[in-house]
Amino acid sequence: MNELSLIIEKLLVYAKEHLDLDALDLIYTRNLLLNKLNVDEPYYGELETDYIKELSVPDLLLDELRNALSNKGVENIELLLVDIMGILSPMPSVVRDRVLRLESEKPGSGLDYLFNLQIKNNYIQKIAIDRNVYFKKEFEDNFLEITINLSKPEKKNDDIKKLLTDKVLLTYPKCLLCIENLGYKGRSNHPARENIRIVPLKLDGEEWFLQYSPYAYFDHHAIIINNSHTNMTISHQTFKKLLEFVNVFPTFFVGSNSDLPIVGGSILNHEHYQGGLHLLPVFYSKDRKVFLKNDDVKVSVLNWYNTVIRIESKSIETICKYADRVFDEWIVYNDESVDIISHTGSTRHSTITPIARKIGDVYQLNMILRNNRTNAEHPDGIFHAHKEYHHIKQEGIGLIEAMGLFILPPRLKRQMGYIEEILSSDDDVENYYSMYQDLLIH
């Protein structure tokens, strides 16, 4: 018996149960896998299937396959596993049609289907994500959330800034967010994406699509991406697009990272938004001051650690009118007494991090005022985490952290473990420093 032929049959049982593999497609898919794994004929023996049908994720079967391939000396096993899960998954057009049909029947159900599919086909690696460290800090009026994400690599602000100017040798796909990643085989410095599935949509007349984040910072963490590879931008059109999105998918919030380094996200060279089901702490913030309240609109400033202007109305057009005015005023606003300078020459420093939500028939737009100025004392950003805190995190403070969920780098779990050992033992601290030199930053 060929071990791989048995594993193929197990994977087919899993796909029938969890990935909507149709009986008509079973023979076809079996032959694709036999060819992919260089196996001449299928397994004909008895097969225990009950435990496979009860699996919620494919990790057990993928571990079997990983070990079998390793024993045969196969290279690039992880890329091959993604390819196989892509073969077992429904085609992108089938997924799109089902998501849209379910959404039309019950808002949120289509996005639930896509989210669960992406867990079951291992695009979202739930077991790995469940290992992330999470804790919540309650305050008198609100709370903050903190997670150590063990999957996402740590980046420096200088590296993020280079994305806008760097030339790359391979230009397909142009970046990790491009729609051309759909089904892409991957390479040494670019992940395989055969198992990703997306939902196309239109925002303000432009072609966009929704996919889920493989890092899943929070429940149903989605990325909404422009079909065109164009730089991040914040403009009047941004506010309209965000509000149009929550009109189509009212169970989700959606927000945009700002378009400037330090106060933006880690990908500046492709326009995208982020959203999901999870209600982040900023949504629970109360008004600090109400500027305007009538039958059409309410405008207030929140009691929050960033300056957040919240605009609420039943009309998208009304919100956009006020949001445009806030944006236009903020990007030229100066107050040197608190180090706010909007421009240095032609270089703009001020921008907005906008977040939209729909509550019943009321639209809400939260506008976080941002400024990325630096000076001699704070070369990494006046309004960024200062140097004395970079041992915790030095990356830019993006949309999600500005909303109250702080995503810390994976090294912290390891480093804190060593520090705990140091504090609870009589071992020489210098021995730890010699073995783990990155502890010196603490």
Which residues fall in each region the model found?
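Helical scaffold of the NTase/Pol beta-like nucleotidyltransferase catalytic core
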Residues: 195-198, 227-254
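Active-site microenvironments that recognize anionic phosphate/pyrophosphate groups
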Residues: 1-224, 228-231, 303-306, 320-323, ...
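Catalytic or ion-translocation cores adjacent to nucleophile or general acid/base/metal-coordination motifs
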Residues: 237, 246-269, 275-334
